[in-house]
């Protein structure tokens, strides 16, 4: 039984970017959040913790490469996600005004769709966006928590066997000795643990924005498809509409063309905002998944569980990007097919031209444009194939 906020019975307006809003508000980076002095200080503190954590993890991993490759990979695997989350944090801050504008405009456009069928589209895709981003949040939370649990269980087992407690942090990081000794060690441990959660909420927020916008654009395209088909519907194809009726259809058709143009413009704006995040994610995804699978092969006991959960979290991340892109492309194709299958040929030449123009525009599928990649399920299969090649190469070397 799912919690109510993950079901279609939950109010739709509260589904709108619910999980990204919750995640980014925790660290003071949600675009619609009031930027008070306390929020600014809190967001800077979280930025500093994440930045220093990335440096300390990378330093530790590079230092241990010639000493112990398994220990080095134990640090370098999570640092890739941490650096990626830092990129996402900076991008969200840099584009906060544009993101706020997009959030407000898409909210306004979706609120205009009020028919029973359109409300069904909204309920379906709003709920899907919340469910998938919450799944990502759960995977990320479990991954970050598993690192701390692993360290605590390892040390508890050491104590039961009469050995000393190892003063290390949940994530392998290089710190001055003073910070790894009592009385400062508990504070260092808590801050490193919080660093893991900052990493999680950053990628949940950014990935949730991407998936949410893609699914909300899909809703707008489906609603546009219904309006076009309803407008062009003709009861008797042999009977020509009156001049007044044709004039009304032309006016309504112009509004629909403008709506289609605006969705295309919003997609372009989203591409500009998400280009750095999406490119970095697609470039590093194979490396991150491959490294985590290699860690599964190298570790035993609790280490395997940690990296199985980690692999699931990274896999869900890249799946959300590809799923969102596929939904937009499919909605565009359906719009073109449905418009061409309507009764456009029963109207005046001007209406026919406008209809065929919309068909031509819809056939140029809307995508989130990033260099070298196009988010889609086909791209996901290519990434997984390349990941398999990296794993095979790593196994042969190690």
UniProtKB/Swiss-Prot annotation:
It is found in: Cell membrane. Keywords: Cell membrane, Membrane, Olfaction, Receptor, Sensory transduction, Transducer, Transmembrane, Transmembrane helix. It comes from the Eukaryota. GO terms for biological process: detection of chemical stimulus involved in sensory perception of smell; sensory perception of smell; signal transduction. Residues 1-14, 68-74, 146-199, 291-295 are cytoplasmic. Residues 32-46, 96-124, 221-269, 317-398 are extracellular. One of its GO terms (cellular component) is membrane. The chain crosses the membrane at residues 15-31, 47-67, 75-95, 125-145, 200-220, 270-290, 296-316. It is a multi-pass membrane protein. Not expressed in either the antenna or maxillary palp. Disulfide bonds: none annotated. InterPro entries: 7tm6_olfct_rcpt. GO terms for molecular function: ionotropic olfactory receptor activity; odorant binding; olfactory receptor activity. The atypical heteromeric and topological design of the odorant receptors appears to be an insect-specific solution for odor recognition, making the OR/Orco complex an attractive target for the development of highly selective insect repellents to disrupt olfactory-mediated host-seeking behaviors of insect disease vectors. Odor-evoked OR currents are independent of known G-protein-coupled second messenger pathways. Belongs to the insect chemoreceptor superfamily. Heteromeric odorant receptor channel (TC 1.A.69) family. Or1a subfamily. Interacts with Orco. Complexes exist early in the endomembrane system in olfactory sensory neurons (OSNs), coupling these complexes to the conserved ciliary trafficking pathway. Odorant receptor which mediates acceptance or avoidance behavior, depending on its substrates. The odorant receptor repertoire encodes a large collection of odor stimuli that vary widely in identity, intensity, and duration. May form a complex with Orco to form odorant-sensing units, providing sensitive and prolonged odorant signaling and calcium permeability. Involved in the behavioral responses to pentanol, hexanol, octanol, nonanol, propyl acetate, butyl acetate, isoamyl acetate, methyl caproate, anisole, heptanal, 2-heptanone, r-carvone, and nonanoic acid. Also responds to pyrazines. This is Odorant receptor 24a. It comes from Drosophila melanogaster (Fruit fly).
């Amino acid at each position: 039984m799912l919690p109510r906020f993950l079901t279609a019975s939950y109010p739709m307006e509260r589904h709108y970017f619910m999980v990204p809003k919750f995640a980014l508000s925790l660290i003071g980076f949600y675009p619609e959040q009031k930027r008070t002095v306390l929020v600014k200080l809190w967001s800077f503190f979280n930025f500093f913790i994440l930045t220093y954590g990335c440096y300390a993890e990378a330093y530790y991993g590079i230092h241990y490469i010639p000493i112990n490759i398994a220990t080095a990979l134990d640090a370098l695997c999570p640092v890739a996600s941490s650096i990626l989350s830092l990129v996402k944090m900076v991008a969200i801050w840099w584009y906060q005004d544009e993101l706020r504008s997009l959030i407000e405009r898409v909210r306004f456009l979706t609120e205009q769709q009020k028919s029973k069928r359109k409300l069904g589209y909204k309920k379906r895709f709003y709920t899907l966006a919340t469910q998938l981003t919450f799944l990502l949040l759960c995977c990320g939370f479990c991954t970050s928590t598993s690192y701390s649990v692993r360290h605590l269980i390892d040390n508890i087992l050491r104590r039961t066997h009469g050995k000393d407690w190892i003063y290390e942090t949940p994530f392998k990081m290089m710190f001055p000795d003073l910070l790894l000794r009592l009385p400062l060690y508990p504070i260092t441990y808590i801050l490193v643990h919080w660093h893991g959660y900052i990493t999680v909420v950053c990628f949940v927020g950014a990935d949730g924005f991407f998936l949410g916008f893609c699914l909300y654009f899909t809703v707008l395209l489906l609603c546009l498809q219904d309006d076009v088909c309803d407008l062009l519907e003709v009861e008797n194809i042999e009977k020509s509409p009156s001049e007044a009726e044709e004039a009304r259809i032309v006016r309504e058709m112009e509004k629909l063309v403008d709506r289609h143009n605006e969705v295309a413009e919003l997609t372009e704006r989203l591409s500009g905002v998400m280009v750095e995040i999406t490119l970095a994610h697609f470039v590093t995804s194979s490396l991150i998944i491959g490294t985590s699978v290699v860690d599964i092969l190298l570790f035993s006991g609790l280490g395997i569980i940690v990296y199985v959960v980690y692999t699931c979290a990274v896999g869900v991340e890249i799946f959300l990007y590809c799923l969102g892109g596929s939904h937009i492309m499919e909605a565009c194709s359906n719009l073109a097919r449905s418009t061409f299958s309507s009764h456009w040929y029963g109207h005046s030449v001007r209406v026919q031209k406008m209809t065929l123009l919309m068909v031509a525009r819809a056939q140029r599928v809307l995508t989130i444009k990033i260099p070298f990649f196009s988010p889609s399920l086909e791209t996901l299969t290519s990434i997984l194939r390349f990941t398999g090649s990296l794993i095979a190469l790593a196994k042969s070397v190690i």
